[in-house]
Curated annotation (Swiss-Prot):
Keyword Manganese in annotation: no
PROSITE patterns per record: G_TR_1 (PS00301), G_TR_2 (PS51722)
Organism whose genome encodes this protein: Clostridium perfringens (strain ATCC 13124 / DSM 756 / JCM 1290 / NCIMB 6125 / NCTC 8237 / Type A)
Family, as annotated: Belongs to the TRAFAC class translation factor GTPase superfamily. Classic translation factor GTPase family. EF-G/EF-2 subfamily.
Name under which the protein is recorded: Elongation factor G
Cellular component, GO annotation: cytoplasm
InterPro entries, per the entry: EF-G-like_DII, EFG_II, EFG_III, EFG_III/V, EFG_IV, EFG_V, EFG_V-like, G_TR_CS
Length: 688
């Protein structure tokens, strides 16, 4: 099947935002204007096309990122809808990995909110070019100029307005396009009847001021234009657009536009902005990977290159079973073909290929370079796996996911539900890499762990709804860790020689505190321990580190230097050295000033002025550390770091302290030492 749209006419982009900034509504409107939706879906009535899981429709938030294809003025747009709730950062992370550009939606009343910062940092990590759409311009308290300031201050980004609003709050009628220097006024409810006219007289000065600032910002990114600009020459519309596109793709400028998706104003202009300023697959660096020899290899976005694709999300569909959402980076992926899953080293057959439109699907013969779609029929593929041809194997860069910070015990209400629950949990863990499940060896309970209370609520909800497993749920538990404060040396000898073949392993190690991941250094000289036994010592230490000496929590942030030991010609074995390694680790830990660490959350609380003192007092009583305060639209914003263990049930406490008027958002920030008294309490409970 010949390619319908050339690569330069592709835009693969995501829509990212804080919860409630109007992201799903904005996506709905894009689908409406691009002709893929005949009736507009409203998040308020739970009728939105993008939010296709029942829990999303009930809660009015987007949980699963659905990739949708639509068309606009001769361009193919692939939109990835990403959740704005912090518990679902995994979805954002995985969608950013396969995007070329993004639109950040801000709420005109609030500007940059906590989750906006989180998502922005994630996008920085992948170097994703962005534009900003200031939504809800019709809402009371809307302030476009304040939004731009919050972007500059809190995100340290070079935000440049390319539109300014005409009126705001209930007087919002349209915008001035600063590039063309014309006013765009919306005449009807569906935003189809648009009048283009001169800039209103009362906005002329403001438009001139912002237009001059925009032209200067664009000229600064291009030497030729800068010379013209300094010589006082007029820059043409074409020159400005070309330079703005280049500066946006290079992350030098973040263009800012405005609108009200709910009122159908400004969405078409935003889609034009996506086409004009966000990159095509040819504008961004080609994807990198490693071949089987461990050498770096680059795959250009071209149908003629060997096929390589990344499975960025696994979902279970009630009608067709397992779907693997995939982006093809190079070559062509054909239905019915055999490919190699190079991450797992297994062959897979591509069953059917579908292009998703929110929750309906269109079957296709093939997916070409830069296309996104879902593969049905893959058996062994999980999130982050690479699919490629057997003739030219490659493993594309892996995705990294954070470890869970909260866990709960869960059990089925009936004996018969046990097996069903096991199958369901493993399916859910396949879909979501930040969700983990295991059996507690001591109690025999099934434990589920995730990124926050809402995350686990939704997992339990899905067990009941999709898999028909009724569960009892325990109280949430914090994922503590343990670490050490000082470097120590320790040794251990494991010797058993009583008739027959004995066991002998002996090692000396140094355990050193670090900031990073676990490291193992082999500093053995002169063959004190034979080379084949070194990995056994490492494995013994790794296993022992899963359960520390204070309260049995995993030990992190340390390095081991194995520097001496001894062996026995006959009695030494891998097993003996593994046991010696684990004994040496425990001996070292006992001397190394071990401490308990707890997850600390970054919390942002928004409250009316009159409740401020009460709420700050409450933050302090929760062992919170104040980071700062701002005021926004008559409300006070309190920023603080608070231990996760103190945040359980906070929503209810805040509601009662502020008569339902306070809101908060939190995300995991870092691990920190637990105070001595609490360490003893946690250890006491665990060691009962």
């Amino acid at each position: 099947m010949a390619r319908q749209y050339p690569l330069e006419k592709f835009r693969n982009f995501g829509i990212m935002a804080h919860i409630d900034a109007g992201k799903t509504t904005t996506t709905e409107r894009i689908l409406f204007y691009t002709g893929r939706n005949h009736k507009i879906g409203e998040t308020h009535d739970g009728a939105s096309t993008m939010d296709w899981m029942a829990q999303e429709q009930e809660r009015g938030i987007t949980i699963t990122s659905a990739a949708t294809t639509c068309f606009w003025k001769g361009y193919e747009l692939n939109i990835i809808d990403t959740p704005g709730h912090v518990d679902f950062t995994v979805e954002v992370e995985r969608s950013l990995r396969v995007l070329d550009g993004a639109v950040t939606v801000l709420d005109a009343k609030s500007g940059v909110e906590p989750q906006t910062e989180t998502v922005w940092r994630q996008a920085d990590k992948y170097g994703v070019p962005r534009m900003i759409y200031v939504n809800k311009m019709d809402a009371t308290g809307a302030d476009y100029y304040n939004c731009i300031n919050t972007v500059r201050e809190r995100l340290q980004a070079n935000a440049v307005a390319i539109q300014i609003p005409i009126g705001q709050e209930d007087q919002f009628q349209g915008m001035v396009d600063l590039l063309t220097n014309q006013a765009i006024i919306f005449k009807d409810d569906l935003g189809k009847d648009i009048e283009v006219s001169d800039v209103p007289a009362d906005l002329a000065d403001k438009a001139e001021e912002y237009r001059a600032a925009m032209i200067e910002a664009i000229a600064e990114t291009d030497e030729e234009l800068m010379m013209k600009y300094l010589e006082g020459e007029e820059l043409t519309l074409e020159e400005l657009k070309v330079a703005l596109r280049k500066a946006t793709i290079n992350n030098e400028i973040i263009p800012v536009i405005c609108g009200s998706s709910y009122k159908n104003k400004g969405v078409q202009q935003m889609i034009d902005g996506v086409v004009d300023y966000l990159p095509s697959p040819l504008d961004i660096p080609a994807v990198k990977g490693t071949n089987l020899d461990g050498e770096e290899e680059v795959r250009e976005a071209s149908d003629d290159a060997p096929m390589s694709a990344l499975a960025f999300k696994i979902a279970t569909d009630p009608f067709v079973g397992r779907l693997a959402f995939t982006r093809v980076y190079s070559g062509v992926l054909e239905s019915g073909s055999y490919v190699l899953n190079s991450t797992k080293g297994k062959k897979e057959r591509i069953g059917r290929l579908v292009k998703m439109h929110a929750n309906s699907r269109e079957e296709v013969e093939s997916l070409e370079a830069a296309e996104l779609g879902a593969v049905i029929g893959l058996k062994n593929t999980t999130t982050g796996d690479t699919l490629c041809t057997e003739a030219a194997p490659i493993i594309l860069e892996k995705m990294e996911f954070p470890e869970p910070v909260i866990s709960i015990a869960i059990e089925p209400k009936t004996k018969a539900g046990q097996e069903k629950m096991g199958i369901a949990l493993s399916k859910l863990a396949e879909e979501d890499p930040t969700f983990k499940t295991w059996t507690d060896q001591e109690t025999g309970q099934t434990i589920i762990a995730g990124m926050g209370e809402l995350h686990l609520d939704i997992i339990v909800d899905r067990l009941q709804r999709e898999f028909k497993v009724e569960c009892n749920v325990g109280a949430p538990q914090v994922a503590y860790k343990e670490t050490i404060k000082k470097a120590v040396e320790a040794e251990a000898k494991f010797a058993r020689q009583s008739g027959g073949r004995g066991q002998y392993g002996h090692c000396k190690i140094e355990m050193i505190p670090t900031e990073g991941e676990y490291e193992f250094e082999n500093a053995i000289v002169g063959g004190a321990i034979p080379r084949e036994y070194i990995p056994a010592v490492d494995n013994g230490i790794r296993e022992a580190a899963e359960s520390g000496i204070i309260a049995g929590y995993p030990v992190i942030n340390f390095k081991i230097r194995l520097f001496d030991g001894s062996y026995h010609d006959v009695d030494s074995s891998e097993m003996a050295f593994k046991i010696a390694g684990s004994m040496a680790f425990k001996n070292a830990m006992a001397k190394a000033d071990a401490v308990l660490l707890e997850p600390i959350m970054k919390v942002e609380i928004t409250v009316p002025e009159e409740y401020m003192g009460d709420v700050i007092g409450d933050v302090n009583s929760r062992r919170g550390r104040m980071e700062g305060m701002d005021s926004r639209n008559g409300a006070q914003i309190i920023r603080a770091f608070i231990p996760l263990s103190e945040m359980f049930g906070y929503a209810t406490a805040l509601r009662s302290r502020t008569q339902g008027r306070g809101t908060y958002a939190m995300e995991f920030d870092h691990y920190d030492d637990v105070p001595k008294s609490i360490q003893e309490e946690v250890a006491g409970k665990k060691n009962k």
